[in-house]
Design a protein with these regions (language model features):
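Conserved alpha-helical scaffold segments that buttress catalytic/binding sites
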Residues: 1-186
Length: 186
């Protein structure tokens, strides 16, 4: 774990008192359009200071929550499987410590580590997926772990009808046909 010099939106509670732990996953291993997702955790931290922290709907300040920013996981350069395993292990530790994990960063493929760890504790979990693409390919350019098949890997963990997709505008025809029987898209 590499501690960041900048925390996300005043998330400065100590680990022991926090009920939520945010961590970054800087990784760019399977990005196919434009690289740069590895910079997302730091940029999201920087830009978070421009956000409003008060919710008029809940009449609460986000800063009232006990949130610890753990920093960034050390990237497994060029090895998406190792990075996913690292995320899985860290998320599993957070859950065993009764912490709510929030991962920021990197590319879509990394979500598999968090999904697997959370599903082991909460097998009835569902995924709300907001994206332009289905990400439901089994294999993408001969790779089973990529940004283009992360939701297919999630389906392998969760099973049918546990994934709800919103905003989907494109994907391969076979992904849409497969989704009709296995996920919920709108």
């Amino acid at each position: 774990m590499k501690k960041s010099t900048l925390t996300f939106l005043f998330c400065d509670s100590e680990y022991s008192e926090a009920n939520t732990v945010l961590f970054g996953a800087p990784f760019d291993g399977t990005t196919s359009f434009r690289p740069g997702t590895r910079f997302a955790p730091q940029i999201m931290r920087q830009e978070s200071y421009g956000l409003e922290v008060y919710s008029p709907y809940q009449n609460k300040e986000l800063t009232d929550k006990k949130i610890f920013d753990a920093g960034d996981l050390v990237p497994a350069i060029g090895n998406v499987g190792l990075m996913i395993d690292s995320i899985y292990d860290f998320t599993k530790k957070l859950i065993s410590d009764n912490k709510l994990p929030i991962m920021i960063g990197g590319e879509h493929s990394l979500s598999v580590g968090t999904i697997k760890a959370v599903a082991e504790k909460y097998p009835d979990m569902y995924i709300l997926h907001f994206d332009a693409h289905t990400d439901l390919r089994d294999v993408y350019y001969e790779h089973k772990l990529s940004h283009a098949n992360v939701l297919y890997r999630a389906w392998e963990i969760l099973g049918d009808q546990k994934i709800f997709q919103f905003g989907i505008r494109s994907g391969a025809k076979d992904e849409f046909e497969w989704a009709k029987n296995h996920s919920n898209s709108s």
